[in-house]
A protein has these predicted regions:
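Glycine-rich flexible loop motifs, especially short His-Gly-Gly/GGXG/HXGH segments used as catalytic or interaction
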Residues: 185-220
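A structural signal for short, hydrophobic/glycine-enriched beta-strand patches
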Residues: 2-195
Length: 220
């Protein structure tokens, strides 16, 4: 048993409940794929190589599911971001959806800015947990049977924990590349402990969510 017994038991309970939920809904039709966005965009408009790699992996899955006669939709999260004071011209969602459409994905199979606004309002989608919250909300409200997430290898555990906190457990797929935004050591010793200590899934009244929003949301 881990040193922090109560925290371990709490998360074990959440994980078991999430698995039970997925077992109950697997009879439903359809797969929802969340493609974790990655800032900054190239020239403020185009997905960077890490983001593009995830989108390419999702496209392959999309095409395979369609070939097998399955219904599949994709959600690309992410509001308009800034980094080091430089703001992207469009949202991560718009950049990702544009990329997917250009590579043959039916635009009617895409969720992006509309979902961000519906579930996060003016707060926007500015961290991994926001991404998972919106994807979970879409998954529940639209009655999908399966959920998949494509993300950074270093980011995968924290995103899985976010999903578990929101009551679901997707099929998690990591997409490696040479230069990654997320760092394994930072995740293990900074970001995951902060997430576990937050208690809200970085949602309502979260100090960490507020910090990230102030860091990444452009000043209009």
């Amino acid at each position: 048993m881990p040193a922090n017994d109560s925290q371990f038991l709490h998360w074990r309970k959440l994980a078991d409940e999430a698995r039970n939920t997925m077992a109950q809904v697997q009879k439903n039709d359809g797969l929802l794929i969340e493609v974790a966005a990655q800032h900054p965009l190239i020239d403020g408009v185009y997905p960077n190589p890490e983001f593009s790699a995830r989108l390419d992996a999702a496209i392959k899955r999309y095409e395979l599911e369609r070939q097998n006669g399955e219904m599949v939709k994709l959600y690309v999260p992410g509001s308009r971001h800034m980094q080091d004071g430089v703001a992207d011209q469009i949202s991560l969602s718009a950049a990702g959806c544009n990329y997917l459409e250009t590579h043959g994905v039916d635009p009617t199979d895409l969720y992006g800015e509309d979902a961000n606004l519906k579930y996060k309002g003016d707060d926007g989608v500015y961290n991994s947990s926001d991404e998972c919250y919106v994807a979970t909300s879409l998954f529940r409200d639209l009655g999908f049977g399966r959920l998949a997430s494509y993300c950074s290898p270093a980011q995968l555990m924290r995103k899985a924990l976010s999903y578990i906190q929101f009551g679901v457990l997707p099929y998690m797929y990591s997409v490696p590349c040479e230069h990654m935004f997320h760092d394994y050591v930072d995740e293990a010793f900074i970001h995951i402990p902060v997430f576990l200590g937050d208690g809200t899934g970085l949602q309502v009244n979260s100090d960490e969510a507020k910090r990230l929003r102030e860091l990444r949301k452009p000043v209009e």
